[in-house]
């Protein structure tokens, strides 16, 4: 995008009739907000990048009709008049892929916001502003790979690597997917900027030179050798998600919820604590202060790598397209984000892309579609909404990357959806649920009760539970059984609560009372999590597993004692200390290490059995 824009601008300078052939430009015919119609555009291609007006505004052709082209403009069109020139660039909207992406914040069409601020000294983006997506001044220490002069090279092959930062130590330099040939020269190890030539290749008698970055059209998925089935969990550090509704690395997840339910908090905790190598966080049409919060918090958050503390900003790229930025760029920002994610996947990394929120993206589609006069479908959204969403989610997955050496990477998509009034029958939510495999449904009532994360366990689901059984069998053998038991206790308690409202708790049998009491315990001490504490902000999978064991063994021992004739009212009073110990297991500090915390849990399991045995004697 900005990469292509920058390259295009180098060639374009200012639009003037003397510099270009007449067939390279058209004229503006009509303007309607971000949608501009230009005439005399014969030979123009769909999705071609164009420059509109004397300010060189960036636009993209979205419809062709005779010699007229309809263009969506990614900048404010105030002041553009009929008859202004429109210049064709002959290339699609593309992003620059190379060293320097991490720790950077871009807008929806990959313009670096920090560089623009330094250049313009303004908090707003001036129209027609220019700044390359990847800094041309910074020098990177390039190390050539195993390939040498005379070797054949094809698309996706790694021909070198650079040290980007201490979290991304090995940023691989790839040959663009459609390139190939025989190496005639490769740069020796040393410091180079991203646009300096580091490789020369000959193919069919022609010489081609490549630098450390290349551009790629955002609407075209990057090719892979083979798609694989995903079978490793994407660990979020949220107990309710990791235990009951797990996602996989390479999976698709939807988080719908009304305002104030905590969608952004879940998205941000995924970025902070998930087991991903790189995070692409796309703030798509959300509030600007949420992006500001991310920018303030991320540099202060640390992850531990090989005993070193590293700020997680080093593995994060932000694409910020807030509500006050042009609508058309919001539509492009999702594609920008997924293309950046695919680039890191091609390096053999597990990437998470967080889109917050895809409802705003759909609203941008609705607005553009309305201006084009297309036939509206449900609630005014275009009829092709489902197809657009599917083509975006289809770019997720685990795959063997193109080229050699062999490497496997994955792109996981987590999309927040904000249906109006929290209504899950909204077209965006229903279309998304038909495509994604995991549904983390947020409940307004739980959020109002300050139950966070406010996941409604009765409506949420994950279709990856069976896929992950192999992982659980080799690491946590009882995990699937414990998960099913906890789900069973929660669903039974929900049915019993309706009975209690009719006849009161005293009318229930002791066994049913245990179900209700343990369900309350699970809801308050297992499903709830305090994101602002050291012990609970992130819960590792081994702590989640031991906590599940503790709750289920407490339930089983209680049921066993009641079956042997004990009275639950008396028994629960006598074993109050055990109940307190089980509920306090969330306070075990994970930073003490797995072995130490596991030893504490072993003591807890033993004390549960002892206390119930004593109380029933």
Swiss-Prot record:
- SUPFAM superfamilies linked to this entry: C-terminal domain of alpha and beta subunits of F1 ATP synthase, N-terminal domain of alpha and beta subunits of F1 ATP synthase, P-loop containing nucleoside triphosphate hydrolases
Quote the InterPro entries the UniProt record gives: ATP-synt_VA_C (IPR055190), ATP-synth_a_Xtn (IPR031686), ATP_synth_asu-like_sf (IPR023366), ATPase_a/bsu_AS (IPR020003), ATPase_F1/V1/A1_a/bsu_N (IPR004100), ATPase_F1/V1/A1_a/bsu_N_sf (IPR036121), ATPase_F1/V1/A1_a/bsu_nucl-bd (IPR000194), ATPase_F1/V1_b/a_C (IPR024034)
Which keywords belong to this entry? ATP-binding, Hydrogen ion transport, Ion transport, Membrane, Nucleotide-binding, Translocase, Transport, Vacuole
Q: Which CDD domains does the UniProt entry name for this protein?
A: ATP-synt_V_A-type_alpha_C, ATP-synt_V_A-type_alpha_N, V_A-ATPase_A
One GO cellular component from the entry?
Answer: fungal-type vacuole membrane
Positions annotated to bind ATP: 257-264
Does the record carry ATP-binding as a key word?
Answer: yes
* Highest taxon above the source species: Eukaryota
Could you tell me the membrane topology recorded for this protein? Answer: Peripheral membrane protein
Cell compartments where the protein resides: Vacuole membrane
The reply to whether ATP-binding figures as a keyword in the UniProt entry is yes
Q: What is its EC number?
A: 7.1.2.2
Q: Which GO terms describe its molecular function?
A: ATP binding; ATP hydrolysis activity; proton-transporting ATPase activity, rotational mechanism
Coiled-coil portions: none
* Major subcellular site: membrane
List, alphabetically, the Pfam families matched. ATP-synt_ab (PF00006), ATP-synt_ab_N (PF02874), ATP-synt_ab_Xtn (PF16886), ATP-synt_VA_C (PF22919)
Record-linked PANTHER family: H(+)-TRANSPORTING TWO-SECTOR ATPASE (PTHR43607:SF1), V-TYPE PROTON ATPASE CATALYTIC SUBUNIT A (PTHR43607)
As for family, the record states: Belongs to the ATPase alpha/beta chains family.
Function statement: Catalytic subunit of the V1 complex of vacuolar(H+)-ATPase (V-ATPase), a multisubunit enzyme composed of a peripheral complex (V1) that hydrolyzes ATP and a membrane integral complex (V0) that translocates protons. V-ATPase is responsible for acidifying and maintaining the pH of intracellular compartments.
What's the name of the protein? V-type proton ATPase catalytic subunit A
Origin species: Eremothecium gossypii (strain ATCC 10895 / CBS 109.51 / FGSC 9923 / NRRL Y-1056) (Yeast)
